[in-house]
């Protein structure tokens, strides 16, 4: 098979500004980043200095026009996604309306041009930048809620322009339909799902699209890997379990993410509590709380997510180091591409470098297609056989033999030590023991554990009532257990009136 990969920047990615890892963006014509050096002695250094991957659509022997037509056809023919659009924009601007009006913010001399057409929010500072977008920390105007949010401003002229040729790299803006698809899916999957970044609002003006989401205060899991080199098995399990719960929630609804990677995992920070007054090691794992500063983990960036029809998709896309082999070797692929990506993430968490790395792109694709990776010494010497077994089942080249999401959540290693355990309890509530409960019960068990130590620090009745949220799931939705098969009969909804109620702690926000 002849593979001729080309990379197409999707143009609406979140590029966080961090001092810990180098990356290049498509705006500078450098959308290809340095790959990990094949010399195993330099693995961690290479990963830290040049391995940040932007979200790229990977086009393997598929013309951009054919790929675009395929995606557009699926969107236009999918009445349920049209319903999502109607639901999202019912209280916002209509799809065909734009506005040249500026916000009512008093100053006319704005620091950021994006502020001129933005309503109801004040941009405070830039926290990220992409080829056709910038991300800002912002606060609401004329509202009692002053909690900061993240706003991604996507410039229209950037995403509607024709393909721009940069040497051998082809950079193409995303269509308006793709932006609306991202918004629709983000709103749907984040509803009552604590492990996806929360969608707040969407605005469209004459020159920009604005996506308003929650501000996740800890940063990327990628940066913690760079800082800590690698995670302990307990900490890796703590992170990957939450990622799996987020993917489970999406797969319930027939949605595949297609870009799971450390750069797309954010976390809420937790403080370090030393023993007997001594500061603990930064990467030490605390039962029921977390470690490495990592508490609640959230999946972000739904620009490549898609609601599947007939349980399969055919558009090749993703981030090459984390993309499953069938994406570029088969005509169609299933939700199990997310499981491959989870395997790549778990591998990276445990040893500090990804399973597939190669300077030459064709060689890299061949390695992925063969599942050619190794548990190299010394990084894997002290990692348990259970962890290696979980990785092996996730990085199975044959998708029919690969773990699905339920297989992974039932994996013995994932259940051998429980990051969901409440440290007040002497018993373990393992993932396996609660799989027969609803999604929100599993998530709530985790939140109870994560919040336990915070509750001890601030145990007043006022703080408990003011800093809590509720997670809901209807009794009718309990039949969604197990792997998703077929199209949902109706939109996946969680109804307040008929739900079981679960309370979780929400930590106060301190950011940048």
Swiss-Prot record:
Q: Where is the active site?
A: 259
**Any idea where the Protein kinase domain is?**
121-414
Q: Which PROSITE patterns match?
A: PROTEIN_KINASE_ATP, PROTEIN_KINASE_DOM, PROTEIN_KINASE_ST
Q: Which CDD domains does the UniProt record give?
A: STKc_RCK1-like
Q: Which GO terms describe its molecular function?
A: ATP binding; calmodulin binding; protein kinase activity; protein serine kinase activity; protein serine/threonine kinase activity
Q: Does the keyword Transferase apply?
A: yes
Record's keyword terms, sorted? ATP-binding, Calmodulin-binding, Kinase, Nucleotide-binding, Serine/threonine-protein kinase, Transferase
Catalytic reaction annotation: L-seryl-[protein] + ATP = O-phospho-L-seryl-[protein] + ADP + H(+); L-threonyl-[protein] + ATP = O-phospho-L-threonyl-[protein] + ADP + H(+)
> GO BP, one example?
regulation of meiotic nuclear division
**Which residues does the annotation say bind ATP?**
127-135, 152
An annotated GO cellular component of this protein is: nucleus
Q: Record's InterPro entries?
A: Kinase-like_dom_sf, Prot_kinase_dom, Protein_kinase_ATP_BS, Ser/Thr_kinase_AS
Disulfide bond positions: none
In short, the EC number is 2.7.11.1
Give the residue ranges for region: Calmodulin-binding: 502-512
Q: Could you confirm whether the keyword Chaperone appears in this record?
A: no
Q: Which family does it belong to?
A: Belongs to the protein kinase superfamily. Ser/Thr protein kinase family.
What is the protein named? Serine/threonine-protein kinase RCK1
Q: Which organism is it from?
A: Saccharomyces cerevisiae (strain ATCC 204508 / S288c)
What gene name is given for the protein in this entry?
RCK1
